[in-house]
Regions:
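Oxidizing extracytosolic/periplasmic lumen-facing domains
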Residues: 1-190
């Protein structure tokens, strides 16, 4: 078997090798920078942080699940679009931790919803439909009937504990937006 000679001139070969080296450096730089940003983000969120609340203003499920969040720090509005395991309802409020050094860097805590006016919610009973628990995520799904309409809701909890499928639970349902509901236990300590 004979290996055919290429038809490239020495100058063309050199240019091809330079392009390969350039693209390799560019690719390496991209992954290094991405890794640096991830580490920098972790560092900024591990120390010198504050907690405030954020409002869900939109969501997207095109390639991945993303919630659009808006929060305010020292009179300045910030918007973030973190990846999420679930789509939450527009108008919900959650706790968000942000870096004091760079308030654009934040992390939402979906296990801590915020209710500003408890009078806007009714307490009713719901039935646990399913539970999911892993090392990083605990999801409780429940069904409820509000004003003769059936609703389903997934919420993220720190731990599922003794909540089992079929158990009856007390939930809080938003009177104007019944799709928004929470496990009453999430607010017992407040």
């Amino acid at each position: 078997m004979k290996i055919q000679k290429d038809n490239l001139t020495p100058k063309q070969k050199r240019n091809a090798y330079l392009w390969i080296i350039f693209l390799s450096i560019l690719l390496f730089s991209f992954f290094y920078y991405k890794s640096y940003l991830k580490e920098n983000r972790k560092e900024l969120l591990s120390e010198n942080t504050e907690i405030t609340f954020c409002k869900i203003i939109g969501s997207n499920t095109y390639k991945s699940t993303t919630n659009y969040l808006e929060y305010n720090v020292n009179g300045k509005d910030y918007e973030t679009r973190p990846l999420s395991s679930r789509v939450f309802n527009i108008g919900e409020f959650y706790e968000i931790k942000y870096s004091k050094l760079n308030p654009e860097i934040s992390e939402v805590n979906y296990t801590k919803p915020i209710i500003f006016n408890r009078n806007k919610f009714d307490q009713i009973n719901g039935i646990i439909d399913k539970t999911y628990e892993s090392e990083h995520l605990s999801v409780l799904s429940f069904k409820y009937n509000y004003e003769n309409k059936e609703y389903e809701r997934d919420i993220i909890l720190e731990k599922i504990e003794n909540l089992k499928k079929g158990n009856e639970i007390k939930i809080l349902v938003n009177k104007k937006k019944p799709k928004i509901s929470y496990l009453e236990k999430q607010f017992k300590a407040e």
